[in-house]
Amino acid sequence: MSALGSGDSNHGNSSGLDPLNSYLSLPILISSKNEIEATGIPSQKTTAQQAAVFLLDSGMVGETAPMVQLFMQKMKEEGFRSMLKNQFIKHTDACVDDFLKGDVKSLFRNTKQLSKVVLNHFKPMIPKKFHQLWALGIESNAFYLKLCGSGGGGYILGFTENIDRAKKALKGHKIEVVYTF
């Protein structure tokens, strides 16, 4: 049972974070297993070249159970566990810190690295039709993508320093801007 809930589902126990987040209508910062708090985010700004966080609709329904099974299988590999600790968690934590501090330059540097790590090590969890698009974002610096949840479909989280440039690069794809700064 997790610290926040024990709702059984097809992939194990629920953390209860999604309902808590919905109830509070605030971002939640998880510092450790026992340190969970509501937090603020930097205020939104209107600039000529607006940075943004967006959702990219994959148009596919992702099934959680196979993605979790794949992840658990990969966790048996020492190299994967090492990458998770030394790259994935490192860049994820840096992105959160940069975002909360408002350090946009560092945020996008770390987001690019995180996007590369996900593409290189979580590729089976990314819908195949998005592999090239994911790489294009990294190579062009127009946008960077990150899996939402277990992957396999649903929404993909996107970050861009220039939303107009990202929209052009993502033409033909359904995106929804959720935050600008």
Segments (PLM) and residue ranges:
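C-terminal nucleotide
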Residues: 3-13, 17-150, 157-181
